[in-house]
Amino acid sequence: MCIRDSGIRVNVTLIFSQSQAILAAKAGAKYVSPFVGRVDDNSFGGLCLVKDIAKVFREHMVSTEVLAASLRGVRDVGRAFEYGADIVTMPTKVFEGMYNHILTDKGLDQFDKDYAESISGV
């Protein structure tokens, strides 16, 4: 019996190679989680691993989704999606870094000033 046949949506975590992801998908996992940061810590190419897994899943029409984990920077998030990740996980500081931007802050300050001037009759 395949895991998927039981109705349980399984995430196989601690994926460090394309072959591990393929085995998990063949066993019926709904998600595989390559640990990008940990791969980078021990070699290089954590995001390339995401790309390689997503590519083989697409080519073979595998329905298992790629959940890129252990992302450590804002750029990692964008690249993970660019390389085919379906889902990402990240620390709060990375999430906050995604929506915080100096130009956004400056723009909001200017909007506030413009609004204040418009209602004060200046």
Where does each model-flagged region fall?
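Catalytic beta/alpha-barrel core
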Residues: 8-22, 33-43, 66-70
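C-terminal helical cap(s) of enzyme catalytic domains, especially alpha/beta-barrels
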Residues: 50, 97-121
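Short, small-residue-biased leader/transition segments that mark boundaries at the very start
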Residues: 1-2
